[in-house]
Amino acid sequence: QSVLYSTGGAFSMLLPYNQESEQKLVALIADIKAKVYRTHQEQLVLLNYVVADRSDLESEPYPIFAKLQEQRNRDKYSPLYASIQNEYEHLLQPGTTPKSPIINQMDKLGAALGQMKYVLVSSQKVTGDKLISIEPGEPGIYYSLLTEENLPNSFADEANSTLIIYNEKPNKIIKYPWRLEYMAGFGESFLSFEDLLDNRLGVRRMGVLRMDVDNLGKTLRKAYEQKLPLASFAHKSRQLDKFFKQRLHQIWLRDYIDSVIIIYSGGDDLFIVGSWVNVLKFAKTINQLFVETFSEDQISLSAGISLVESKFPIIRAAESAANEESVAKQFGYVDTKGISRFK
């Protein structure tokens, strides 16, 4: 198997094909969708596939990926259809609550993320002092959040486990499988929203920033049409991932750790909150670095910023920033980046 593209909320893979593997894939997709729906009441729409010959991939790959995109869009714009069919009786059962059973686990997870530096992925639940372990959707895969203090040297399920190390390797020797990943803003304590208010220029507000890449789909489609090697897509994916995770984390640690929180940064977009003055400065720095890094690509960034008080619901602030981001995308000038703000 080969990962062609994996960034943000999407991925593309090449898998060997036979009838048995297709049957297993269809069953796996149905199982994952059902478990995601039962846990989050949402449908995972990215799990689609098409069958292709090697000759087609080597000569005309674009129609294959276009067909895959059509299938994804079909699921995306008919949300929850299959899941609602399967869960019809459950939805109409008296006394059921819309609250997801995983909400309490996610609350604990979110509260602990700021201090955690490692995530252990295992097929068995790991227990220990001050250790948080969850099994989202109950697929038989556990995610345990660890610190340097409770990081085990060894445990029973080593053969079926992987330790994900974020940003820097631990001091102790790890005897089981591990991999190093970068995650912007991970492993640091968080400030409160009240701490992030900035009163400079007489405006006491917090800045909420949403930013993502423009024209990425067009760039990939152009690469398909030019018959570039499939490995080039994997390279572009890794390049974007490195930018939004490693490079931004380095800048944040150096200049903005005391005034900005990175809620999410990965793939081709980001979501940050902080001092509104420094959020604007950070956005400018990110854009300048992006232009330097991807100068040979026809891609750019658009951003939306909302300025809110500390007690303003963060979800609504994020929606406002996303709306302003959409306005920025409609700026209309070629090779010109757009930032839209909402106050």
Name what the model sees in each region.
Residues 1-343:
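Regulatory and interdomain segments flanking nucleotide-handling catalytic cores
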